[in-house]
């Protein structure tokens, strides 16, 4: 077998090692004259095997911050780390700015400014958005029963025609006597009650002007026949309403002023305590017409009176 001299082909490991040595030489030669990204043109110190590591260097140029550090690997090789940061200015509220100036304590007493991973966990920011539903508010306003009574004038003062009771009128001591004097001059009577339709005439005195005794058979109305009260009572039951949640200070006159604007009233019954004479909290109002009673229920039910909300409903017919 013939033998001859020939060049052996180098292995792949030898090629990589030779290329690495060439790269190190070229890199060390080029870094000597290349300026830093921050504009620093000072030459880089040479990293010799026996020399100590240079101290870290920090350079700030505008909003760019460059930090240069040197470290040694386990095999004794030295290398340089260059980190570049962009400085951002963020606006914070006064409360956040004051908290950042607080002095740290405990395990973080000697930590630099900013959060420490060992003691602080920084989570994602959660943005809260407060939404007010105007539609729900509009629905609540529409369902409010008090809004239905805003355009209605339920109570009218007899003295100043205001929206309050006559007994609580601020002008009753001044305008009241003046109206009485004017009514007397015009020939009007303010003391007599207004006669309602269907109301009977008051019974005259038993004695005549001469002072003689008049027997009952000869008095006014003796020739008239008595009328049955059953039909009238049934009509009253059909147009009677029941008012509850009244205050203890309520009187018949207050109920008369409250329900008179809705129609003619035939009778009012206010339940009272026998010993104290105060109201028990409910009353019955009878109208001459059922339509007036229906308007009174729609207008007064839910109305605020003497710091209480009145409840008005149809009265149950009597079984007697």
UniProtKB/Swiss-Prot annotation:
Which residues lie in Basic and acidic residues bias regions? 221-233
List this protein's GO terms for biological process: formation of cytoplasmic translation initiation complex; translational initiation; viral translational termination-reinitiation
Q: Cite the InterPro entries for this sequence.
A: eIF3_g (IPR017334), eIF3g_N (IPR024675), eIF3G_RRM (IPR034240), Nucleotide-bd_a/b_plait_sf (IPR012677), RBD_domain_sf (IPR035979), RRM_dom (IPR000504)
Give yes or no: UniProt keyword Transmembrane helix.
no
PTM comment text: Phosphorylated. Phosphorylation is enhanced upon serum stimulation.
Keyword Phosphoprotein included in the entry's annotation? yes
Record PTM Phosphoserine, positions in chain: 8, 11, 42, 189, 223, 264
Which Gene Ontology molecular-function terms are recorded?
A: RNA binding; translation initiation factor activity
Q: Which superkingdom does the taxonomy of this entry point to?
A: Eukaryota
User: What's the chief localization of this chain?
Assistant: cytoplasm
Cross-referenced CDD domains: eIF3G, RRM_eIF3G_like
Return the GO cellular component terms, semicolon-separated. cytosol; eukaryotic 43S preinitiation complex; eukaryotic 48S preinitiation complex; eukaryotic translation initiation factor 3 complex; nucleus; perinuclear region of cytoplasm
- Please give the start and end residues of each transmembrane region: none
Quaternary organization: Component of the eukaryotic translation initiation factor 3 (eIF-3) complex, which is composed of 13 subunits: EIF3A, EIF3B, EIF3C, EIF3D, EIF3E, EIF3F, EIF3G, EIF3H, EIF3I, EIF3J, EIF3K, EIF3L and EIF3M. The eIF-3 complex appears to include 3 stable modules: module A is composed of EIF3A, EIF3B, EIF3G and EIF3I; module B is composed of EIF3F, EIF3H, and EIF3M; and module C is composed of EIF3C, EIF3D, EIF3E, EIF3K and EIF3L. EIF3C of module C binds EIF3B of module A and EIF3H of module B, thereby linking the three modules. EIF3J is a labile subunit that binds to the eIF-3 complex via EIF3B.
Q: Per its database record, what is this protein's job?
A: RNA-binding component of the eukaryotic translation initiation factor 3 (eIF-3) complex, which is required for several steps in the initiation of protein synthesis. The eIF-3 complex associates with the 40S ribosome and facilitates the recruitment of eIF-1, eIF-1A, eIF-2:GTP:methionyl-tRNAi and eIF-5 to form the 43S pre-initiation complex (43S PIC). The eIF-3 complex stimulates mRNA recruitment to the 43S PIC and scanning of the mRNA for AUG recognition.
Give the family per the record: Belongs to the eIF-3 subunit G family.
Q: What is this protein called?
A: Eukaryotic translation initiation factor 3 subunit G
Organism annotation: Mus musculus (Mouse)
Q: Give the classification, highest ranks.
A: Eukaryota, Metazoa, Chordata, Craniata, Vertebrata
């Amino acid at each position: 077998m013939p033998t001859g001299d020939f060049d052996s082909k180098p292995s792949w490991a030898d090629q990589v090692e030779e290329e690495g040595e060439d790269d190190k030489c070229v890199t060390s030669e080029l870094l000597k004259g290349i300026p830093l990204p921050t504009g620093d043109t000072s030459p880089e110190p040479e990293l010799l095997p026996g020399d100590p590591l240079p101290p870290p260097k920090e350079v700030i140029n505008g909003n760019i911050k460059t930090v240069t550090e040197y470290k040694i690997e386990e095999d004794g090789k030295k290398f340089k780390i260059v980190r570049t940061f962009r400085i951002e200015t963020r606006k914070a509220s006064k409360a956040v700015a004051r908290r950042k100036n607080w002095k740290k304590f405990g395990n973080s007493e000697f930590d630099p400014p900013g959060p420490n991973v060992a003691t602080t966990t920084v989570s994602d920011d959660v943005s809260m958005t407060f939404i007010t539903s105007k539609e729900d508010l509009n629905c609540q306003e529409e369902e409010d029963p008090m809004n239905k009574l805003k355009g209605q004038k339920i109570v009218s003062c007899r003295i100043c025609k205001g929206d309050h009771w006559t007994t609580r009128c601020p002008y009753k001591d001044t305008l009241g006597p003046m109206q009485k004097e004017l009514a007397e001059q015009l020939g009007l009577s303010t003391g007599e009650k207004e006669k309602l339709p269907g109301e009977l005439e008051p019974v005259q005195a038993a004695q005549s002007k001469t002072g003689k005794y008049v027997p009952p058979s000869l008095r006014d109305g003796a020739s008239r026949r008595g009328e049955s009260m059953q039909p009238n009572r049934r009509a009253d039951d059909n147009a009677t309403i029941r008012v509850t949640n009244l205050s203890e200070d309520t009187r018949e006159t207050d109920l008369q002023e409250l329900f008179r604007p809705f129609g003619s009233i035939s009778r009012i019954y206010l339940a009272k305590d026998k010993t104290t004479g105060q109201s028990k909290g409910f009353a019955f109002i009878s109208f001459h017409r059922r339509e007036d009673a229906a308007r009174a229920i729609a207008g007064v039910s839910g109305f605020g009176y003497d710091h209480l909300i009145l409840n008005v409903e149809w009265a149950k017919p009597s079984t007697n």
